[in-house]
Amino acid sequence: MRERILETATSLFVERGYDGVAMREISDACGITKAALYYHFTGKAELLSEIFTAYLDEIAVVVSAGVDGGGSAEAQLRRVVRGMFEVPVERRAILRLAMHDVGSLEAEHRAAFGQAYQKRFIGPLQQLIADGVAQGEFVPKDPELVVWMLLGMLYPFFAPSRGAHATAESGTVDDLLDIFCHGLGRTD
């Protein structure tokens, strides 16, 4: 039942945002009483925290797989981003939800998520960029800034309404990576 509640809450939060969903709506969508919902979760903030943690687990595996595959820093980065686009858009949308609604978590959960997000997602991406710079593959730029720029490019594709066409197999991902890694300038 917990998994069903989490799936339902995720869908509703992604669709309407954290503040746009009441516990009653989650219980109704699950076909359970509000009391039964509270038996499994103490409140919306706990639901949101578990959703974020589960997504972070999922995306950390994607990042690790991309980096652990070896090769050039660009090849690793391409594997990571393609891996992110192999995740269904409904799951990718959780990253948008996290960026928008992390402030709804209690301070302790927000801090814990922020630390885990940095350690398991942002930090490895920054290290990948730093390694590419150290190897002379990337121009010397601040890895933190570069990662935030990358996420800024990816962010629109994490919206269910716009991201459905962008998959690991679509040309969109390769175009995005080509522009990110090599710019828009002509090389001929």
Where are the regions that the model predicts?
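Hydrophobic/aromatic-rich alpha-helical bundle segments in the mid-to-C-terminal region
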Residues: 95-100, 111, 130-179, 187-188
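Amphipathic alpha-helical packing segments from all-alpha helical-bundle domains
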Residues: 57-65, 90, 108-134, 144-148, ...
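Short coil/turn segments at alpha/beta junctions that flank glycine-rich nucleotide-binding fingerprints
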Residues: 15-19, 70, 91, 135-136
